[in-house]
């Protein structure tokens, strides 16, 4: 990255620098970075899966809260392939199903016993649903709850801002990104200084600290073009209705911002119809970036689910 893009990333604050453990898991030749807080032998592990063009760092407000509130719970975060510190494979190797496989590889390596709660934000929502659908029975039996944040169980391009991905113009843009990646980087570099104010309009609907908006913009800028292109088709067409049968036993929450333009309320209501045990909650006046924009809503959902499970025996 050069110029404005480099400056955007250089000046941003770094998070998850004080983790208890960190490492990499090999997933068919792709290294997936993971981060842990809390005891390795914890009875309950909360797994947090971030969204498209983000990274595990996007949950820093949740880890800060949960470490203080629930010191006996283990927190496991990871950078999805193509994001953060994980390897950046080719566009053809980026999809929701492959990302879910990566998560399952990390869980198989790191979480051998105890209850598991899975939280997915944005693209991490469909990825977490795919994890549930693909999980081996032994792991599925230990899943004790789930939280879907600004998520979708149907195609992301079916409604909201994501419909832009299904237009002819978007296809032309992504064809250009795929065919001329070096030119794409130059284009992205030239507009990097404009990203933050655009995000303030499109993603953040509540008044939000400028540092958090610039942090979000920097994460997007740090995402390689091949990752943007690779997940493009799945963002348009991927759906996880096949995961619905495995949701039926689980308690949990579906959270959505009242003014979310990316995954509108209708998407969360659709999840709720497939998952009758979930509590559907709307963050008043908020947009798509609830972990940063409305962190108390996300923290409260995890807190309530942990308290709900506190009296239940672990497996």
Which positions does each model-derived feature cover?
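Flexible "cap/lid" loop of the alpha/beta hydrolase fold
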Residues: 133, 137-183
């Amino acid at each position: 990255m050069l110029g404005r893009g480099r400056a955007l990333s250089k000046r941003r604050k770094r998070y998850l620098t004080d983790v208890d453990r960190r490492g990499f898991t090999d997933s068919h030749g792709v290294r997936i970075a993971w981060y842990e807080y809390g005891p390795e032998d914890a009875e309950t592990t909360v797994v947090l899966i971030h969204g498209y063009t983000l990274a595990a760092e996007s949950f820093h407000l949740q880890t800060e809260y949960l470490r203080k509130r629930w010191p006996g719970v283990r927190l496991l975060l990871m950078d999805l392939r193509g994001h953060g510190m994980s390897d950046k494979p080719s566009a053809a190797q980026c999809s929701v199903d492959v990302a879910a496989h990566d998560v399952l590889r990390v869980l198989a390596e790191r979480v051998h016993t105890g209850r598991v709660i899975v939280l997915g934000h944005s693209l991490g929502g469909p990825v977490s649903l795919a994890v549930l659908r693909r999980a081996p029975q032994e792991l599925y039996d230990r899943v004790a709850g789930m939280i879907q944040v600004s998520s979708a169980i149907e195609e992301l391009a079916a409604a909201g801002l994501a419909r832009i991905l299904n237009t002819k113009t978007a296809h032309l843009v992504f064809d250009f990104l795929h065919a001329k990646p070096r030119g794409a980087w130059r284009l992205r570099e030239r507009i990097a200084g404009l990203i933050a104010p655009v995000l303030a309009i499109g993603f953040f609907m509540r008044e939000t600290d400028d540092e958090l908006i610039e942090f979000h913009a920097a994460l997007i800028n740090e995402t390689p073009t091949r990752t943007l292109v690779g997940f493009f088709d799945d963002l348009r067409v991927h759906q996880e209705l096949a995961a619905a049968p495995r949701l039926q036993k689980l308690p949990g929450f579906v959270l959505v911002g009242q003014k979310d333009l990316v995954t509108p309320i209708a998407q969360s209501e659709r999840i709720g119809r497939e998952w009758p045990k979930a509590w559907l909650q709307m963050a008043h006046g908020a947009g798509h970036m609830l972990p940063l924009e409305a962190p108390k809503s996300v923290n409260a959902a995890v807190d309530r689910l942990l308290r709900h499970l506190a009296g239940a025996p672990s497996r």
